[in-house]
Amino acid sequence: MPSAEGVKLGEVKFAGTLLAAAALALPSPATAAPLICIDPGHDATPDLSLERIGPGSTIYKIKDGGGAPGEAKVVLQIGFKLRTLLLNRGYRVAMTRTTDEFTYGNRGNIARARFCNRRGAALMLRLHADGSTDSSRHGVSTLYPAWHAGWTDDILPQSRRAARLVQARVVAATGAKDLGLVRRADLTGFNWANVPAILIEEGFMTNPTEGSRLRHPRYQWKVARGLARGTGDFVPLP
């Protein structure tokens, strides 16, 4: 995750007045580039402790079941590529994890949502890959929050729009089967989000062909380009 760059203050004389050069150069918050929060799913080590699926909920889910075989590594690799593309386009980027382990806060999906919330993300991109006992299953799908008063009602319209735009771009970039959009009410990372949030299942790790593609850097760049283009459609640069 790129850190804020320090600015060396200089002084400029103008009509007998000293002005801070840095103050002249710094963009106002209104013109700052949108921040995209990339959330590579899972960790190398599962975390089976429980957390509420939404604020005040009596329903609990495990924080991290580990995902499909190899998923955590693949989505991190794609996340790095996506970060490069977005930074090159002029976006600001934050990543929930840049190593094998997510260590922010109390970990889990509440912490992932809070990480993006506190940075005021224009979009939270949750990167995942699918798994199935049926090894013939393949394709890309994008999940978005279901409506729930007090949880997702404020982010649902924008999240659904982002899901549609990103799904179309990833399918076009990869040629993968289009499995469409999926509305989910039970995902902790959605229910605690205060910013538009979507989850992209970038393919099936359990399909021999698709799983092999997802592990290959060339295909990962295709996925990342689709994600970047869809993000650009949803959050144009000022």
PLM features per residue range, with description:
Residues 15-27:
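Bacterial N-terminal signal peptides
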Residues 28-32:
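Sec/Tat signal peptide C-region and signal peptidase I cleavage site
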Residues 33-113, 146:
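Active-site histidine-acidic residue metal-binding/catalytic motifs
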Residues 47, 126-134, 143, 178-238:
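Active-site-adjacent mobile loop/cap segments within catalytic or ligand-binding domains
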Residues 69-77, 103-110, 153-161, 214-225:
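Soluble non-cytosolic domains of exported or imported proteins
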Residues 80-92, 98, 117-121, 129, ...:
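Sec-exported extracytoplasmic/periplasmic mature domains
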Residues 108-122, 187-192:
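Mature extracellular/periplasmic domains of secretome proteins
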Residues 155-186:
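Active-site-adjacent substrate-binding region
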